[in-house]
Amino acid sequence: MAAKSQPNIPKAKSLDGVTNDRTASQGQWGRAWEVDWFSLASVIFLLLFAPFIVYYFIMACDQYSCALTGPVVDIVTGHARLSDIWAKTPPITRKAAQLYTLWVTFQVLLYTSLPDFCHKFLPGYVGGIQEGAVTPAGVVNKYQINGLQAWLLTHLLWFANAHLLSWFSPTIIFDNWIPLLWCANILGYAVSTFAMVKGYFFPTSARDCKFTGNFFYNYMMGIEFNPRIGKWFDFKLFFNGRPGIVAWTLINLSFAAKQRELHSHVTNAMVLVNVLQAIYVIDFFWNETWYLKTIDICHDHFGWYLGWGDCVWLPYLYTLQGLYLVYHPVQLSTPHAVGVLLLGLVGYYIFRVANHQKDLFRRTDGRCLIWGRKPKVIECSYTSADGQRHHSKLLVSGFWGVARHFNYVGDLMGSLAYCLACGGGHLLPYFYIIYMAILLTHRCLRDEHRCASKYGRDWERYTAAVPYRLLPGIF
């Protein structure tokens, strides 16, 4: 359910000649073949409670001014019943259904029908037709990278409407926020169910499918590795980036417009949240080609975790800071605002530079300079399913010599900055940093398990050279 996926441990060479042998791929690619009781319990818990968590947070803002304990206190003390809270919840509306259908259709058209032109005039930007990483079955998919273009065109239309056309109010997203939640849930469940049926009956690449024999695990974690319709519509790339992440900045802009409508001004806290989160969104689309080598594309299958998560969890819970500031227009002191800005920018610097170091190392096969020096590497090897031996390199210089996942530290610093922009009045806006800390720690451990299975003793040499996973001296 993450908006910003993270790269695997930096490697200089891709995986060639790989087949979908169960023994070789179980620890290296994709999700598990078999399900232990803890994983199954976790899956069932998320399927049951994740939709409720989203509803609870949004309802708490709508009915209790973002006080998370408000609904519980009212129910326990008898001041309200669950039926009372539900009765006050706005239902799905025709307007919301029309808006959401138009939105998703527009993003599908931008994704499938408009080849990228940004790479033709933006120096350093890599777009157009690009290859992804090799799959467990040895397939190398091609992708139409045009996310930055879609983001730019979408926001150009948004600002044209706000300042010239006046087709709709900039507050339209906030004004229909809960009715749109039901629409997003319908799409999330529909695409997840379709992906599961497709995996059973007409998969894009049957050799990349995984079945556990457990319905709930298959539904949540997915069966197909890269489900597609036609040549270019890739479920993973579309739903991870569009409609959720393109919408992220639009949602924040709508929240800012609502704050101005209600309070006659936009606070510096709202400006900070909009600017800092926009930096990460633009970075995501500027580096969309790099994203093809991240854990979401290279490891995760497409199921409810990605389908529903990207439609509902991401746009509704990653934007809680902006929503909170509509109800609580926090105006930060100058030192507080400067501190939040610096924390966010330093976090982004670490996040971007660490990923750039890894990408540069991979593209040049280690023939580069990192922090002005020739990079130190751990030479390693692994055997693929066809018995072929491959050689690779693990980077131990730059930020990757500080900790094995130091890019996550930058991500966490940025996440904390969003939350601190909201002051200390309520817990709700701090959900994001709590969630990201859990998510990135889990990803860190999952990636390390996969790399240990792949590289064996060479991985032990690497962990000896870089002893800390995330925080030097701590973890």
Swiss-Prot record:
Where is NADP(+) annotated to bind?
A: K358, R362, L395, W400, N407, Y408, D447, C451, A452, S453, K454, Y455, Y462
Where are the membrane-spanning stretches?
40-60, 154-174, 177-197, 266-286, 306-326, 331-351, 420-440
Q: Tell me the impact of changing A24S.
A: No effect on 7-dehydrocholesterol reductase activity
Catalyzed reactions:
cholesterol + NADP(+) = 7-dehydrocholesterol + NADPH + H(+); 7-dehydrodesmosterol + NADPH + H(+) = desmosterol + NADP(+); 5,6alpha-epoxy-5alpha-cholestan-3beta-ol + H2O = 5alpha-cholestane-3beta,5,6beta-triol; 5,6beta-epoxy-5beta-cholestan-3beta-ol + H2O = 5alpha-cholestane-3beta,5,6beta-triol
Instruction: Specify the superkingdom.
Output: Eukaryota
The record's subcellular location field reads: Endoplasmic reticulum membrane
* Family according to the record: Belongs to the ERG4/ERG24 family.
Protein's job: Oxidoreductase that catalyzes the last step of the cholesterol synthesis pathway, which transforms cholesta-5,7-dien-3beta-ol (7-dehydrocholesterol,7-DHC) into cholesterol by reducing the C7-C8 double bond of its sterol core. Can also metabolize cholesta-5,7,24-trien-3beta-ol (7-dehydrodemosterol, 7-DHD) to desmosterol, which is then metabolized by the Delta(24)-sterol reductase (DHCR24) to cholesterol.
User: What's the protein name?
Assistant: 7-dehydrocholesterol reductase
Taxonomic source organism: Homo sapiens
